[in-house]
Amino acid sequence: MSEKRVVMVVDMQNGVFETPRHQREKCVSLINQLTQAADTVIFIQHTEAGGLEEGSEGFALLPELHQPAGALYVTKTACDAFYNTGLEALLREQGIREFVICGCATDYCVDATIKNGVSRGYHITVAEDAHTTANRPAAD
């Protein structure tokens, strides 16, 4: 197990938050506390057509989110941050086998990344109250 404190922040982007999310201010505050205490911070950002294109305002991280010097960034195109990205290579290169995860959306991208990370042998801790989602209609 690594001794570095590693925090992975998923999809805390302007475009993602165009849909209202639960307790945004509290969630961001807790994430900022985590990133300030971390040795390594990895920001995961989703890209897709329709407002989340790389370089767009929608793709950018929330302005109130603390981005420490030396933070690492991974761009993804699917819910799972490991799928067709350089995340696993980055973790291997950095000697990271465990991390704390937080961000948006609890029931989609955070969940998919946790499941796929654990299946690859990573030890993942979910930061309580440092993840959020939107109201979603129940399936019919």
Give the ranges of each region predicted by the language model.
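N-terminal nucleotide-binding beta1-loop-alpha1 segment
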Residues: M8-D11
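Short acidic, Gly/Ser-rich segments with clustered Asp/Glu that frequently serve as metal-coordination loops
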Residues: Q13-T19
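Short glycine-enriched, charge-decorated loop/helix-capping segments at active-site entrances
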Residues: P20-K26, G51-L52
